[in-house]
Regions:
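Radical SAM enzyme [4Fe-4S]-AdoMet core and its adjacent flexible, acidic
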Residues: 8-146
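Acidic helix N-cap motif at the loop->helix transition within catalytic regions
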Residues: 5
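Short beta-strand->alpha-helix junction loop in the catalytic core
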Residues: 1-2
Length: 146
């Protein structure tokens, strides 16, 4: 998909300053479960293409990952995926209730009442080395509250 876009719209790519991609999982199983109709092989092919184009066109590349019950265990893995594909940042975003999920409270691990909240907090501690303690941190957590 992205290769086709790149070949059809060179002006956009040549003037691109930033590109964000939302990805719901760092594994085939999680990605295809959460992104209905999504294909793990296809997203990886697109990420590889973006990575190569980034080298040539020098735009910022950001991976967005909305953290929830079914993928929070892959927070560290999505950071590694971001590094693999030369992302400038990996944003771990809090899931918000936009009244589109019937089971939001079940998915919302940010709630202290959620049975997996403590495990989420422990996993968040494991990714602290990526959160600005290095010269060039890869991870930003603009909306997550521990």
């Amino acid at each position: 998909m992205f290769k086709e876009f790149h070949s059809r719209v060179p002006y956009v790519i040549n003037n691109l300053q930033e590109l964000g991609v939302s990805i719901d999982g760092a594994s085939k199983e999680t990605y295809e479960k959460l992104r209905l109709g999504g294909k793990w092989d296809k997203i990886n092919e697109n990420l590889e293409c973006i990575s190569k184009m980034k080298e040539k066109h020098n735009f910022r590349f950001i991976l967005h990952f909305v953290v929830q019950k079914d993928n929070y265990h892959e927070m560290e893995d999505i950071i590694q995926l971001g590094k693999q594909y030369n992302a400038d940042r990996v944003w771990l975003n809090k899931m918000e209730d936009w009244n589109v999920f019937d089971n939001f409270s079940d998915m919302n691990i940010f709630s202290p009442e959620h049975p997996l909240h403590k495990d989420y907090q422990q996993r968040l501690q494991k990714i602290k080395p990526y959160l600005g303690f290095e010269k060039n941190p890869i991870v930003e957590i603009p909306t997550l509250n521990t």
